[in-house]
Regions:
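Positively charged n-region of N-terminal signal peptides that target proteins for export
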Residues: 1-4
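Short, polar/charged alpha-helical segment
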Residues: 35-60, 129
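Contiguous mixed-secondary-structure segments that line small-molecule binding/active-site clefts
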Residues: 46-47, 78, 83, 88-153
Length: 153
C-alpha cells in the first residue's frame, strides 16, 4: 500500500491510502500550532477538497503532538498511524541532506531561484522525480505533493 506524503520546501500535505473503503475522514497531523497561517490555508484547501468531492472525503486537521511529536510525523504517515502529515521537507534533512533542497531552495535577495522558477523546476524540470527519489532513498513508501510554496527567508 503506497503512502502519500506532502512535505515540501514550503508546506504541503501528506495523504495515506486508506485500506477501509468506508473511511471518509483522513486524519492529518501538522507540525504547527493550529493558529499558524499555514494551517489556516491547509484548512481552506481541505474544505475545498471536501466540497469538490461532494463531502465524500473529509479531513481532521490535528496540531503538532496530537498523535506523535512533530519530528515523528513522517514516520507516523509511513507506518500508517496517521493518514496525512503537513510539514516542511527540510525537517528531515538530518535523515537525508537533499531534503534541504526542497525545504530551503537556493534563493533570496535577488540571487538564485525564486518561487516561480522553483515551481517550474519542480513540475516540469525533473524536481518532482528527484523528490520521489528522496523518499525512496530514505526508505519511505510515500509520495510528496506541494501545496504552499514559500520563498527563502
Amino acid at each position: 500500500m503506497r503512502k502519500i506524503i506532502s512535505m515540501l520546501f514550503a508546506v504541503t500535505i501528506v495523504f495515506g491510502y486508506i485500506s477501509n473503503a468506508s473511511a471518509k475522514t483522513l486524519k492529518c497531523q501538522t507540525v504547527l500550532n493550529p493558529k499558524a497561517d499555514e494551517v489556516v490555508m491547509l484548512k481552506d484547501f481541505t474544505d475545498t477538497v471536501t466540497t469538490l468531492t461532494g463531502g465524500s472525503l473529509k479531513f481532521e486537521i490535528m496540531p503538532a503532538g496530537t498523535v506523535v511529536g512533530g519530528k515523528e510525523t513522517l514516520d507516523a504517515v509511513d507506518k500508517g498511524l496517521i493518514d496525512c502529515g503537513f510539514a516542511w521537507t527540510h525537517y528531515w534533512s538530518g535523515d537525508h541532506p537533499a531534503a534541504m533542497l526542497f525545504g530551503s531552495p537556493v534563493a533570496g535577495g535577488g540571487v538564485g531561484i525564486d518561487n516561480l522558477a522553483f515551481l517550474s523546476w519542480f513540475q516540469y524540470g525533473g524536481g518532482k522525480e528527484l523528490y520521489d527519489r528522496l523518499w525512496d532513498e530514505m526508505g519511505r513508501d510515500i509520495k510528496g505533493f506541494m501545496l504552499q510554496p514559500v520563498g527563502p527567508e
